[in-house]
From Swiss-Prot:
Keywords: Developmental protein, Membrane, Mitochondrion, Mitochondrion inner membrane, Protein transport, Translocation, Transport
InterPro entries: J_dom_sf, Tim16
Region feature J-like, mapped onto this chain: 60-113
Record's protein name: Mitochondrial import inner membrane translocase subunit Tim16
């Protein structure tokens, strides 16, 4: 009798171990996929932060505002204003949809700002290195 109980315990532990291993592998794969989608590194961190702040991904925002190029500010503004006005509550629109439109524009604005900041920091870094090299050449003289 004890032999059968021991076998049941061993088989149960093996089944639980296999299930745990499979779940762990799936979690690792999902984590790697999420990191790949986010872009990884600092850019991925900024993208994830924007997603959390607005509660919406860049793809969702582009779909809501019917935008192909997230850098086209004129199209974003035009579509945002149209959709926001069409969904006014006083005109029988939906506050929920109106808030989604607002969040989509907010998410796209974050994306535009994120693309502008690295450019300005790159030019500042280039200026800093130029100034450093000039000061070094002056010190050598």
């Amino acid at each position: 009798m004890a032999k059968y109980i021991a076998q049941i315990i061993v088989l149960g532990a093996q089944a639980v171990g296999r299930a745990f291993t499979k779940a762990l592998r799936q979690e690792i794969a999902a984590s790697q996929e999420a990191a790949r989608r986010a872009g990884g590194g600092k850019q991925g961190d900024k993208s994830a932060e924007s997603n959390l702040r607005t509660g919406m991904t860049l793809e969702e925002a582009k779909q809501i505002l019917n935008i192909d190029d997230p850098k086209n500010v004129d199209a974003i503004t035009k579509n945002y204003e149209h959709l926001f006005q069409v969904n006014e509550r006083s005109k029988g629109g939906s506050f929920y949809i109106q808030s989604k439109v607002f969040r989509a524009k907010e998410r796209l604005d974050h994306e535009i700002k994120a693309h502008e900041q690295p450019r300005s920091s790159n030019t500042e870094a280039a200026q800093d290195t130029a100034e450093e090299s000039q000061s070094r050449s002056r010190q050598r003289r």
